[in-house]
Amino acid sequence: MSSCIQEIIQKLIAEYAPTKVILFGSHARGNPRPDSDIDLLIVKETSERFIDRWVMVRRILSDPQRMVGLETIVLTPQELSSRLAGGDQFLAEIVQNGKVLYAA
């Protein structure tokens, strides 16, 4: 795992306290290109609205010096379970093939 990803995960754990972080996409598959984004599914038990969670994570991880894009999906455990039960193939792919980088 790259030092950039490790740094992002450590900051996320320290400042947001997620229950799980899953890396997906080209970085998880081990074939990122120089212009590849870092894609993260972040799971946290919270009552905050979806957009508020996303904004908070973006603020925490904002770094104008980072030379790589960052894409995040922030869900509660209940939202994740519900979407998987509803047949969300995108999330199923992430859960099945992503790399769990952190689990509380």
PLM segments and residue spans:
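Glycine-rich beta-strand-to-loop/alpha-helix junction loops that act as flexible
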Residues: 24-26
